[in-house]
Regions:
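A feature for the membrane-embedded catalytic helix bundles of lipid/isoprenoid biosynthetic enzymes
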Residues: 2-50, 62-69, 97-209
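Membrane-interface transmembrane helices that cradle and orient dolichyl/undecaprenyl
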Residues: 51-59
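Juxtamembrane helix-boundary/capping and inter-helix hinge elements in multi-pass membrane proteins
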Residues: 85-89
Length: 209
């Protein structure tokens, strides 16, 4: 029982579905402890960009530590939500948005200084743009696009690759980026498949009795 509670607290156990407070149509509830963590993460992004782009060659321990702290904040706001029970619709929207902003910020730095293969970075950016389009389409047709588990895991190898590339020139960073890219494309395929099934069900005429 204690082990099950620990898994749920750590975020490993996500059985039971998302909390009802995070669902579409619920109030945003901006003033919560988890959302405050997200606000700090967002506020640190321009600081990271200034430090990283002003580093000279992109390899700067201060920039790497900032990137790590912003990335780790994703775990912190989730833990805060589970400890306090302060779930919110805004938090459900803000968390993936902050993660995407962090990935794109890291991609800009790595592209500028050529720390990682640019073709892979370009694919990542193209994927994020595709997800923005899919999210907009989903909003228009009433589909609530939920993050799948592959998508949750995909972001970590990418962030690790960016973090490591800002510290040292190593093949490990490139390999981690490729792993994250493969998972990211897999997650994207799942999103589009879900969207296709939703549209099929939406356009299917209801049978009359």
């Amino acid at each position: 029982m204690a082990r099950a509670s620990l898994k749920r607290l750590s975020g490993i156990d996500r059985s039971g579905g998302p909390p009802p407070e995070t669902q579409k149509g619920e109030p945003l509830r901006p003033w919560t402890i988890p959302n405050a963590v997200s606000y700090v993460r967002l506020a640190l992004l321009p600081v990271f960009m200034v430090v990283a782009l002003g580093s000279g060659d992109g390899r700067d321990p201060t920039a790497a530590i900032l990137y790590f702290l912003i990335a780790w904040g994703d775990q912190l706001d989730g833990l805060a939500a589970r400890l306090t029970g302060q779930y919110s619709r805004l938090g459900a929207l803000l968390d993936p948005l902050t993660d995407r902003a962090l990935v794109i910020s890291g991609v800009i730095v790595c592209w500028h200084f050529e720390l990682l293969p640019r073709w892979a970075l370009a694919v990542l950016v193209a994927r994020e743009l595709a997800m923005l389009v899919l999210a907009q389409v989903g909003l228009r047709v009433g589909m609530d696009l939920k993050i799948n588990m592959v998508g949750r895991w995909a972001v970590w190898p990418v962030m690790f690759a960016i973090f490591l590339a800002m510290i040292v020139d190593t093949w490990v960073a490139t390999a981690s980026l490729y792993i994250g890219l493969a998972l990211t494309l897999w997650a994207t395929a799942i999103y589009f498949a879900d969207g296709y099934r939703f549209m099929q069900a939406r356009n299917r005429p209801s049978s009359s009795t």
